[in-house]
Amino acid sequence: MYYLPRPKDSAQGDEVAIASHSDRERLRFADFRFSRTPDGRCSAQVGLDWTDGSRASGSASGQSSPMVDLRVSAEATLRALDAYTNNAYGFELIGVKAVRAFDANIIIVSVSLKQGPGPQRLLGACLVEEDLVRGSALAVLNATNRVLGNFIATR
């Protein structure tokens, strides 16, 4: 916790307690593996760790190409999230796109929820220096961050 001064017109005490980000429990992006085979296929494995030591993992594969590689990475991440939430949301990848903007590579993903409360479409992005495929997985985590935070808080 950290404290902020209370506004002067407040009748209560001098400080307001604000929960810091470290006070919230979060899934950790613990493991990412991506490989291409000589026959032109690719596969991705994603591992997410929880504070109690448990792990949720997901994998996906497909025919390798620059765009399919990004999609496979995003799908593996969504499968790991489905494993963690026991399919509470039914995440589905709508699309993934790599764009060049402001002299940087940006990965953008769109994810839909088949069930559960909250918005039905989520959007996430990740600024990427080199590893676009890993950036795709991180963009999925950015898209689903608020939904997962609510899921974790109500467990």
Region spans (language model):
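Intrinsically disordered, low-complexity regions
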Residues: M1-Q12, G47-R55, S59, F151-R155
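Extended amphipathic alpha-helical scaffolds
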Residues: Y2-S35
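Short amphipathic beta-strand and strand-loop transition segments with alternating hydrophobic
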Residues: A30-R36, I94-V99
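Short beta-strand elements
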Residues: R33-A56, N105-G118
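Conserved active-site and cofactor/substrate-binding residues in soluble primary-metabolism enzymes
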Residues: D39-R41, V68, V72, D131, ...
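Acidic (E/D-rich), amphipathic helical modules within compact regulatory domains
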Residues: L48, A56-R79
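Mixed-charge, glycine-accented linear interaction segment located at domain edges/termini
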Residues: S57-S59, Q115-R155
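Short, solvent-exposed interaction modules
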Residues: L78-L132
